Every structure is written in C-alpha cells, then in structure tokens.
From Swiss-Prot:
Native source organism of the sequence: Burkholderia pseudomallei (strain 668)
Annotated localization: Cell inner membrane
Family that this chain belongs to: Belongs to the ATPase alpha/beta chains family.
Ranges in coiled-coil conformation: none
CDD domains, sorted: ATP-synt_F1_beta_C (cd18110), F1-ATPase_beta_CD (cd01133)
Compositional bias ranges of the Basic and acidic residues kind: 494-505
Top-rank lineage group of the source organism: Bacteria
The protein, known as: ATP synthase subunit beta 2
Principal localisation: membrane
C-alpha cells in the first residue's frame, strides 16, 4: 500500500531498491556519488536540500548529513520543491546543523535490521541499538520500512480465536488470531499494563514472536518495560522499537513502520506467528499532525492533519496475515479527555476487529482490568465463530450489567430496598459478575503480592453461567473479586465462612455473644467505592 503522503502529492511509497542499507546512519560509505547535495535551509526538524546534479532523490528516500563532532543526521525526503531541491524531515536532533552542510542521498528508503539478531534488543526508529547490548553485526539482514501490504489473494482472514486468558476479554470482546484489536482509554486506566499482560500471554500460550512499538511514550515507561521483560523472561522472544516523546516528530511517526518491517520479516521469511503491540497509536497520529504542520499543510478537524484517514489506513492495512503465519495486532489508543468522538479515535476504531474500552469509572471502583463490559465489542462474538453457548452467556452478562447501571440512579436516590424482588436479585448478580470478571495479572504480581491467573474460556463461561443461574446468590461479593475460576472463588468463600464460624465460636466462648460479621451477601473486602449507589 502506498504511503499516506501519496494522497496529497507531498509523498509516496518509495519502491524497494537494491541499494545500500540505511539503519545505522554512520554506514553511508556506498551512497551514490551523484546523490551529493547541500543544506540550503534548516527550520527545526525540516531541512531543505539542493542537488546540483539534477537527479533528485525519490520521495521517502533516506538522506545522511554529516555533522562535525556528532553522529550523522538521518533525514527522509517528503517533498520536491523544484527541479533541484527537496524538503526532508530529520529523524534526529538538528543541533549543530548549518547551511552549506554536505548531504548524501542513499538511494533507497530507511532499512532496519531484522532476524534473530534483533530478538531481545531495544532499537531506535533507524534500527540502531538503544540498550546496553553489543553492536549489531555489519552483515545483519535489513529490510525497508516502506512496503506494501500482501496482495489480497495471499491474505488470510482472521477467524480463529486468540485466547488471552483474560476473562472479560475472552468472553465479551474476543480477539482474533491474525486480527487487530484496540484498547481505548484515557490516561491512567491501565492500557500499558494490559498490553504487557498480553505479551506474557502470547509467550506462554503461543511461543511466538512479540514486536513492541513504543510510540511517543515516556522514556521512564520504556525503561521500566525493558526491565520488567528481562525479569519475567519474555525479552528473549521480543523486539522493542522505541520512539519516545522527547524525539523529533519524524522519528515518532516512523516507529510503527520500523516495527512492522520486523514483524513482516518473521511472518514472511520464518512463517512465525507474531504479536505486534503498539503503545500508543494516538501518539502516531499526534506525530503525523506535527509533521503536517512542519511541512506547511493546513490543518483539518480539531487541528489534525488533512491526511489523517489515509495515514491511519496505510499503517493498519499493512497489518495482515498470510497462509501459515499470522500477525496479531494489539494497539493501545489514548482517548484525549475521554472523548470517544475525537477524530483520531474514530479513525483508528474503523480498522479494528475488537474494541476493548477501558472505563475510568470502573478503575475508580477498583475493578481491574478496568474494561467496560457493555461498551467493549468484537466482530468475533458470533455463534459461527465462538459457538452458541458463548454468545448466549455473553449477551446475558452484558444485559444484566447494563440493567444494573440503569438502576443505579434509583438506588442512589431511594436505596436498594425500594427495588422489587426481581431487580434486587438482578443487582446482586450483576455486582457478582463485575467482581468475577476482575483478575490478578502476572505482570503485577511483584506489586500486589497476588499470583497472576490465566483462565480458559470454558471456565469463564461456566463461571458466568453459574452466577447468572443464581448458584452464587448467597456468596460474599468479595469471594468473587480478583480470582481466576469459579472454583477459586468457591475455595475463597469456604475459607471466609470457616473464619466467620471460628470468630463466632471464639466470641461465644468468651461470653460476648455472637460476633458481628460482614453481610455474607456483600462481604467486607470489596474495593473502595464499590458500594451500592456508585
């Protein structure tokens, strides 16, 4: 597929050429002689270059600009200004760059290292190592970051479930192996933790390759993720590609393409399943808006670039599966000001198979993962894909929780006792379902002290069906909170009842009468803010 810049005449997908590799910007010795130029203007990250030879570099071709006392600057051509000049976007800081500096065209787009050599490594947008490991070998295989999607005849549709072991996702918003899923949420609701748990699930369940693209996020978060992956043992089958928020917009804008090039290699050349994770796709759109402004284009709605739809489509359409190997994409999407009608959010949502919506209200109640069971959805929730039993339970769970939300205003004003018997019963089951759909994560075990739980889809369906049937109506709500299967909750309930019995026996023996215990229907250990009427 063509690069999104092709839609407005300022860029196009550059054809893959048999030219020198461009990943480590210091490796430019075989740049073509006729590609020599000079800098004629520098405006922040925008660099105008004149070429006296008359042969201009193609759009999206990489340029290298030596800088005295520093590493060469890598730039990418985005516009032809005249028959002898181009406008390029620097992918690194332009400090120290001056007019008249020599420029070399490399003869092709940016090329990044791929293969086993990059597993367990942290790379920049150009493929340069950013960790404390050894330098990559000079003969490592490289691929261009600009490529088209596989032909339609070679693409394979996503119709198999990607079981995550996360109850609320597998039940209500199942992911497709070889499909695209997006996790939408505002700041601080748990998107990154959810992405890390899915990396853990992929390594444990599928033994595949994970490629993580950190787009415009905090350097601290990137460092923490690197350390966490080392500690959990998943780094050896993962590639990290970072373009952090302190980097120029061009670097942040191209990071997803670098990650895609690596994922495509393992899909095409090794026939391996790949889990592609991107955090955060909104920052990709944001970087594109910055680039658009730097190149002088008029903004569109809410200040976004006029090419928003085509840029998002060009990225998403490259995420495709072929016969024998699947690329499963899971994307975290920041929702600015919790506004789900934002143009960037709606543009991304149009391309995904599963929408996992994280709720600030559920996070405030301590319901983690804070996934909204009503707003989340998936095209795979179909009897022909997941089966009749799965769909029936999912629909009923969603109906019960939605009806409970409709009753919350009445409960807040009049109290739960003013509801009819059927509504009180439904409220109790809805609250138990909400707590049963919480779950401890393996990646948070070091902080919570609670072992992570991965639950099979059949166990999730069986547990929800039992709650809907009323089998747990006399259980404490706290017994269902942060457990794996219903058997785990049953053991927790039995232990709580046994503890209550011991306390009552001790109180009776001391002559103080029966002890005051928590309401067995609600429990006393539920999360803060999870009482009736919130």
């Amino acid at each position: 597929m063509a690069d999104p810049q092709a839609t407005n005449g300022t860029g196009a997908a550059c054809a893959e050429r048999d030219a020198s590799d461009v990943g480590d910007v210091s490796d430019v010795g075989d740049a073509r002689d006729e590609g020599a130029g000079r800098v004629v203007a520098v405006r922040g990250a925008v660099v105008d270059v004149a070429f006296d030879g008359g042969a201009l570099p193609a759009l999206n071709e990489a340029l290298t600009i030596p800088v005295d006392g520093a590493a060469p600057i890598l730039a990418e051509v985005h516009a032809h200004l005249s028959d002898a000049a181009v406008r390029a976007l620097a992918l690194g800081p332009t400090g120290g760059l001056r007019r008249g500096a020599a420029v070399r065209a490399t003869g092709g787009p940016i090329r990044v290292p791929v293969g086993d050599a990059v597993l367990g490594r942290l790379l920049s947008v150009t493929g340069a190592p950013g960790d404390d490991g050894a330098a990559l070998a000079a003969d490592v295989e490289r691929r261009p970051i600009h490529r088209g999607a596989p032909p339609l005849a070679e693409q394979k549709s996503a119709n198999a479930l990607f079981a995550t072991g996360i109850k609320v996702i597998d039940l209500l918003a199942p992911l497709a192996q070889g499909g695209k899923a997006a996790m939408f949420g505002g700041a601080g609701v748990g998107k990154t933790v959810l992405v890390m748990e899915l990396i853990h699930a992929m390594v444990e369940r599928y033994r595949g390759i994970s490629v993580f693209a950190g787009i415009g996020e905090r350097s601290r978060e990137g460092h923490e993720m690197l350390l966490d992956m080392r500690g959990s043992g998943v780094l050896g089958r993962t590639v990290l590609v970072y373009g952090q928020m302190n980097e120029p917009p061009g670097a942040r804008w191209r990071v997803p393409l670098t990650a895609l090039a690596i994922a495509e290699y393992f899909r095409d050349e090794r026939a391996q399943n790949v889990l592609l994770l991107m955090d955060n796709v909104f920052r990709f759109v944001q970087a594109g808006a910055e680039v658009s402004g730097l190149l002088g284009r008029l903004p569109s709605r809410v200040g976004y670039q006029p090419t928003l739809a085509s840029e998002v489509a060009a990225l998403q359409e490259r995420i495709a599966s072929v016969e024998g190997a699947a690329v499963t994409a899971i994307e975290a999407v920041y929702v600015p000001a919790d506004d789900f009608t934002d143009p960037a959010v709606t543009a991304i949502a149009a391309h995904v198979d599963s929408m996992v919506v994280l709720s600030r209200a559920m996070a405030a109640e301590g319901m983690y993962p804070a996934i909204d069971p009503v707003a989340s959805s998936s095209i795979l929730l179909d009897p022909l894909v997941v089966g009749e039993a799965h769909v029936e339970v999912a629909i009923e769970v969603r109906r019960v929780i939605e009806h409970y939300r409709e009753l919350q205003d009445v409960i807040a004003l009049l109290g739960i006792d003013e509801l009819g018997a059927d509504d009180r019963r439904l409220v109790g089951r809805a609250r138990r379902l909400q707590r049963f759909l919480t779950q401890p994560f393996a990646v948070t075990e070091a902080f919570t002290g609670q072992a992570g739980a991965s639950v099979e889809i059949a166990d999730t369906i069986a547990g929800c069906r039992a709650i809907l049937r009323g089998d747990c109506d006399d259980w404490r709500e706290s017994s269902l909170y942060m457990v794996g299967t219903l058997d785990d909750a049953r053991r927790k309930e039995a232990a709580a009842r046994e503890a209550d019995a011991r306390r009552e026996a001790a109180a009776a023996a001391s002559g103080a009468g029966p002890g005051t215990t928590s309401d067995p229907a609600s429990g006393s250990a539920e999360p803060q803010g999870a009482r009736h009427g919130r």
